[in-house]
């Protein structure tokens, strides 16, 4: 009976370990200048050149302070390979509810929200790698309160 309990515990532990595995292939944040995020400032993410081909689920992370004056943010995301643009998207992300409460969580005055994108990002093998560029499309030419922007890619199942 004791042997059965130990076997059961090992199987449960192995299952939990597999269930908690993170299959993220790329996860990086780029800081925004302390003077604000200017509309001409582009955040650049260089993906590893040896990423497996296939479709990737993408999440955009935004870290901001309460100084950010808007409930949402408009971003333009482009993905290039060998200086050829093959993906471009406009992202409309909500950072606060209609009541003005921040959607994300945080500590120390920094709020983080994660936004899953509906469209997968298709990648093929390449020697040079891919570059993702993100700029903001807000009417305000300089945004205050945005701390950094992140990109996370995981293989789509």
Where would I find each of the regions flagged by the language model?
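C-terminal motif of bacterial Sec signal peptides marking the signal peptidase cleavage site
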Residues: 16-19
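Post-signal peptide N-terminal segment of mature Sec-exported envelope proteins
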Residues: 28-50
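A beta-strand/beta-hairpin structural motif
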Residues: 42, 91-95, 103-119
């Amino acid at each position: 009976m004791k042997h059965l309990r130990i076997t059961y515990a090992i199987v449960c532990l192995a299952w939990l370990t597999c269930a908690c595995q993170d299959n993220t292939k790329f996860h990086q944040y780029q800081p925004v200048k302390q003077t604000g995020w200017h509309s001409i400032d582009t955040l650049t993410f260089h993906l590893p050149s040896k990423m497996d081909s296939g479709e990737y689920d993408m999440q955009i992370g935004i870290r901001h302070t309460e100084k950010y004056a808007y409930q949402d943010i408009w971003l333009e995301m482009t993905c290039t390979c060998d200086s050829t643009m093959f993906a471009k998207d406009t992202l409309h992300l909500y950072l606060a509810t209609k009541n003005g409460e921040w959607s994300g969580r945080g500590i120390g005055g920094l709020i983080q929200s994660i936004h899953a994108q509906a469209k997968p990002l298709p990648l093929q093998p390449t020697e040079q790698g891919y570059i993702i560029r993100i700029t903001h499309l807000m009417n305000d030419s300089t945004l205050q309160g945005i701390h950094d922007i992140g990109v996370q890619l995981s293989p789509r199942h």
